[in-house]
């Protein structure tokens, strides 16, 4: 078996190297090759992690939260394996381990931080048996792949019961996620924001409006956004649990700040949703037994990358790239963009490949009317479904420029724009757009 593990590791490393050389995303291919050679390669490698394995799940915020947790643990002097690129299905998780292994199949890691696609947890969790599951939120996403949220919840509930020793670190402000943790029988800790911070849009789409315990409509003392907030059931008493890690005195603007456990956290990020990402990572490192004394220093150096509010500079134009793949995430993206009061151009690129979900009807649940602001100087629509995106904007009387070629759209805005460009893309548009931006940034 040792020979098979070594062969799988070497073959995967070779495949990853070749793919990188020819400019391809070789991560998942490396994992696929490793499993083909050694079907139990993930069990063999993950069992060598010395202290604990974290699995990060949830609709939005997985990649940022997981990478931030990894950076926080490394700041505490720990050696960590992490699927940084966000390849979160089985092949991507396997690749994270085989590419971190030495040629002889040995792993040198105190922790593993693994982002896991919710539907893929059935293939991942039985193999790695996480010690902690960090659950960020549950929103409607890719209806043609996941179906209704209840299907995703059933999968996660099944995994919680199959790994009974796994502790859940859960967003207590999300009634759906909190119910799962509270009903699972697993031990859990919660994080959240106990007091209102910003006014939530009255017409915002909200999931999980009914109590999972008794079916009664939930009442809210206030909303943060979407269904996140202070909820309770007037019939059975189900309510937001007591928050173990509570972000207080939250400030949102050009940077974010809040207090938690007496620490003042400041981060140079935009977007209220990032308070949750930061708080989740903090809860993770604290639950692992660290006091988080290096957390603030880590934040000052942390670069989200991977298209999560990633910054580029192209011929004097500041470009911000961000992923927006469902109504809740897109609304928060728009909110973050509109916090910038300076003139701006926006490019929206929408694809409908299998990994995106071919059903793009969710675009009609996004509050695009908020982009009808004098600071928005132009909106360009691009990607495979650019015509659909243009129609969506037309229905809220927002004019747009049609340019199916993403690279040309970016070049045009860099040449003729106001010097401040936001590029909002869904999943399969992300990696190609990021490569375009990196290429353009490197041009003289």
Model region roles, listed by residue range:
Residues 323-402, 440-443:
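Active-site beta-alpha connecting loops in nucleotide-dependent enzymes
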Residues 3-192, 200-202, 206, 210:
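Phosphate-binding loop of NTP-binding sites
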Residues 127-137, 228-242, 269-300:
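A conserved, hydrophobic alpha-helical segment in the catalytic core
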Residues 238, 250-253, 284-320, 324:
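Gly/charged, well-structured mid-domain segments that form the phosphate/adenylate-handling core
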Residues 423-444:
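Glycine/aspartate-rich loop-and-adjacent alpha/beta segment that forms the canonical ThDP
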Residues 203-209, 269-280, 306-307:
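Short glycine/threonine-rich catalytic loop with a Thr-x-Gly-x-Asp
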Residues 194-257, 268:
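Cys/His-rich short segments
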Residues 115, 136, 169, 277, ...:
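Residue-level signal for inorganic ion chemistry
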């Amino acid at each position: 078996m040792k020979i098979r593990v070594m062969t799988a590791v070497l073959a995967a490393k070779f495949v990853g190297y070749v793919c990188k050389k020819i400019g391809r995303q070789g991560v998942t291919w490396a994992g696929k090759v490793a499993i083909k050679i050694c079907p139990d390669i993930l069990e063999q490698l993950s069992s060598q992690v010395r202290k604990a394995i974290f699995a990060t799940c949830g609709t939005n915020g997985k990649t940022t939260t997981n990478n931030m947790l990894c950076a926080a643990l490394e700041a505490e002097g720990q050696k960590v394996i992490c699927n940084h690129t966000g390849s979160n299905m089985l092949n991507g998780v396997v690749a994270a381990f085989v590419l971190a292994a030495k040629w002889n199949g040995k792993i040198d890691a105190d922790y593993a931080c693994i982002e896991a696609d919710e539907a893929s947890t059935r293939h991942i969790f039985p193999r790695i048996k996480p010690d902690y599951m960090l659950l960020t939120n549950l929103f409607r996403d890719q209806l043609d792949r996941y179906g209704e949220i209840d299907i995703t919840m059933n999968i996660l509930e099944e995994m919680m019961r199959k790994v009974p020793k796994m502790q859940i670190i859960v967003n207590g402000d999300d009634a759906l996620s909190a119910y799962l943790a509270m009903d699972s029988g697993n031990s859990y800790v919660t994080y959240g924001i106990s007091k209102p911070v910003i006014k939530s849009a009255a017409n915002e789409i909200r999931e999980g409006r009914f109590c999972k315990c008794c079916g009664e409509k939930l009442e809210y003392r206030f909303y943060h956004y979407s269904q996140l907030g202070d909820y309770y059931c007037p019939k059975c008493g189900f309510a937001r649990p007591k928050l173990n890690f509570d972000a207080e005195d939250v400030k949102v603007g050009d940077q974010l700040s809040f207090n938690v456990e007496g620490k003042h956290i400041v981060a140079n990020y935009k977007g209220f949703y990032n308070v949750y990402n930061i708080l989740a990572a903090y809860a993770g490192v604290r639950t692992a037994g660290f006091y988080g004394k290096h957390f603030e220093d880590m934040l000052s150096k942390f670069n989200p990358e991977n298209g999560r509010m990633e910054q580029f500079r192209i011929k004097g134009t500041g470009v911000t790239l961000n992923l927006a793949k469902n109504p809740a995430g897109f609304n928060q993206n728009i909110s973050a963009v509109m916090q910038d009061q300076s003139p701006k151009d926006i490019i929206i690129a929408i694809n409908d490949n299998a990994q995106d979900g071919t059903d793009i009807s969710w675009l009609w649940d996004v509050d695009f009317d908020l982009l009808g602001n004098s600071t928005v100087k132009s909106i360009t629509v691009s990607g495979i479904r650019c015509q659909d995106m243009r129609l969506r904007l037309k229905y809220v009387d927002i004019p747009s420029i049609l340019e199916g070629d993403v690279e040309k759209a970016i070049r045009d805005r860099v040449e003729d724009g106001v010097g401040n460009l936001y590029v909002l893309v869904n999943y399969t548009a992300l990696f190609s757009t990021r490569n375009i931006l990196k290429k353009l940034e490197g041009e003289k």
